[in-house]
Amino acid sequence: DGYDAELCYLRDRTGKEVDFLVTLKGRPWMAVEVKVSETAVDPSLIYFRDRLKIPYVYQVVLEARRDMIDRGVRVVPAHAFLGALP
């Protein structure tokens, strides 16, 4: 069969944005913000997570050396995130 999923870009009127939003059956399921080297959690991820009740929130960082959770957001090296995809 497959999944009733969509991949979107998320931005509000004030300019807050998240690079990727995956929805399942029309509901927000996972948000992903991508950074080159910044491991401090992007405030937009927390804003949208709380506002839209997104269950899985990641900040994927190209140059990160370790995986950590900060305020409920998983900050993960890009190689680990991409390596976990099916």
Q: What are the residue ranges of the model-derived segments?
A:
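A cross-kingdom feature that marks ATP-driven nucleic-acid transaction machinery
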Residues: 1-86
